[in-house]
Each structure stands twice: as structure tokens, then as C-alpha cells.
């Protein structure tokens, strides 16, 4: 998530990082080349015909409804992800506080290990949802923890497993009664649940039929739109197509 100042309109408008511009740039270039080619044909052969705008107005309304559904879906995924990240932070902090409440002050090394494992889990979840987990996210762990983690194919699950073992050892050390472990186990389950929920949001695609319908519909609409605009706007059609592609394809890419 990118932090920004909504009141600074100019900075938001001129921002590049985090926008959909990199995703739509290639599509925009191809559509402008297509529009330029049609302009050349119209000028070279001196074509004089007007398709009218009624059909494209009707198709545009239908396309807008499809894009509204896409926007609502994107916002729902964003909001659900934001809630899960909030739950991740709260659960991690609560687990750390509960751990410190049962581990004696004299066991600073054990306290540090538990805190490091919890912090590493949060970082692993973040990178798991991005480009993959690297050693940078695990540098806060001890060499023994990193070596133990090599036995697991999934670092986040491995960290939870190690955490469970370490916290269960508190029972053997008489630092907590067995019934108390249920609260810690519940927190570990919550951390696992957050990871699964974020995985679902990140990796569940939209239905293929919907994506296919939207992309084909948009390609036909934008591909034929210059034929409507050129007789009326001439070279200004290039500017009109720039904004049309940016608006429609940009919303579809969100």
C-alpha cells in the first residue's frame, strides 16, 4: 500500500509509482499507432464517411457497467486485504505481549527469540505476497532458527511451527499451565488464517469468462472508436484516443 496525501492534488496527479500507467502504456502506444494508421488512410484516400456515434454511445454505456463491476471488485479486494493486514499486526503484537507475560524476565534470550520469530513471520508474509522470501527477511533470526527453517518448504509455515514448539516448551519449564497454551495456539491459528486469506486475495483470479468478455468488448470498442472520431475531430482524434484508452484500460487494469 502506498501512503499519500490526498489533499495534495498536484502531487497525486503527477505521481508515477503505484499508478496504472506502466500497465497501460504498451496498449496505449499500439492504439495510438492504430489510430495514426487510420488517419493516414483517411487522408491519403480522402475518405468521406461518417459512421455516426449512436452505436458507440450504446456500447460505451454497456462497457461502463462492466468496468463499474471491475472497480467494485478491485476495491473489495483492497479493503479485505487492508483488514487482513490490520489483523496480522494486531495478532502479532498480542502474541508478543502474551509471550512476554509468561516468560520470566531472566530469560531475555528466549524472549528475544520469540520476538524475532514473530517479526520474521510478518516480514515473510509481506514478501511471500510479493516477489518471494529472501534471506534479508530472515536476518533477524538466529543462525539456529535459520538452520531449523531450512527443513520447511514454506518459511511462514515453518516459523509458525517453530513458534509453536518454543511456546509449548513454556509448559515444560512450568512458566504456564497447559490450559493457558490454548490462547497462544489460537493466536498462531489466527496468523495462519491471515496468511491463507491474503493468499486467496493475491492469487485468486477473476473468472475467465468475465475477463475474456471485458477484454474482447474493450478491444472492439476502442479499435473502432477512431472511425467515429476521425470524421469529426481529424488529428485531435489522437488526443481523444489517448484519454479514452487511459480511462477504459486503466480502470480495467486496477
Regions found by a protein language model. Name each.
Residues 1-86, 105, 109, 231-238, ...:
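N-terminal juxtamembrane/topogenic regions of multi-pass membrane proteins
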Residues 17-21, 151-152, 212:
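Solvent-exposed interaction patches of small proteins and small membrane subunits
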Residues 22-31, 199-232:
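Transmembrane alpha-helical segments and their cytosolic interface motifs
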Residues 74, 124, 225-226:
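Short, hydrophobic/aromatic alpha-helical segments in well-folded domains
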Residues 83-100, 246, 254:
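Membrane-cytosol interface motif
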Residues 98-210:
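Structured inter-helical modules in multipass membrane proteins
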Residues 120, 215-253:
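C-terminal, helix-dominated tail/subdomain
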Amino acid at each position: 500500500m502506498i501512503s499519500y496525501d490526498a489533499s495534495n492534488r498536484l502531487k497525486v496527479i503527477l505521481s508515477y509509482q503505484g499508478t496504472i500507467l506502466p500497465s497501460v502504456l504498451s496498449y496505449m502506444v499500439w492504439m495510438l499507432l492504430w489510430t495514426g494508421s487510420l488517419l493516414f488512410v483517411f487522408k491519403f484516400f480522402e475518405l468521406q464517411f461518417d459512421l455516426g456515434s449512436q452505436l458507440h454511445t450504446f456500447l460505451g454505456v454497456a462497457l461502463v457497467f462492466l468496468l463499474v463491476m471491475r472497480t467494485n471488485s478491485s476495491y473489495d479486494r483492497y479493503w479485505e486485504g487492508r483488514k487482513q493486514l490490520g489483523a496480522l499486526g494486531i495478532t502479532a503484537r498480542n502474541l508478543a505481549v502474551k509471550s512476554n507475560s509468561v516468560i520470566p524476565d531472566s530469560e531475555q534470550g528466549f524472549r528475544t527469540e520469540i520476538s524475532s520469530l514473530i517479526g520474521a513471520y510478518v516480514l515473510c508474509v509481506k514478501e511471500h505476497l510479493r516477489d518471494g522470501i529472501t534471506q534479508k527477511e530472515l536476518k533477524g533470526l538466529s543462525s539456529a532458527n535459520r538452520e531449523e527453517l531450512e527443513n520447511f518448504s514454506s518459511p511462514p509455515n515453518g516459523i509458525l511451527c517453530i513458534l509453536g514448539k518454543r511456546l509449548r516448551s513454556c509448559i515444560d519449564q512450568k512458566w504456564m499451565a497447559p490450559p493457558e497454551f490454548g490462547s497462544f495456539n489460537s493466536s498462531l491459528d489466527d496468523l495462519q488464517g491471515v496468511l491463507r486469506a491474503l493468499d486467496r486475495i493475491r492469487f485468486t483470479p477473476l473468472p475467465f469468462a468475465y475477463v475474456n468478455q471485458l477484454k474482447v468488448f474493450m478491444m472492439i470498442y476502442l479499435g473502432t472508436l477512431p472511425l467515429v472520431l476521425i470524421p469529426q475531430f481529424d488529428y485531435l482524434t489522437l488526443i481523444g484516443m489517448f484519454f479514452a484508452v487511459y480511462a477504459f484500460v486503466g480502470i480495467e487494469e486496477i
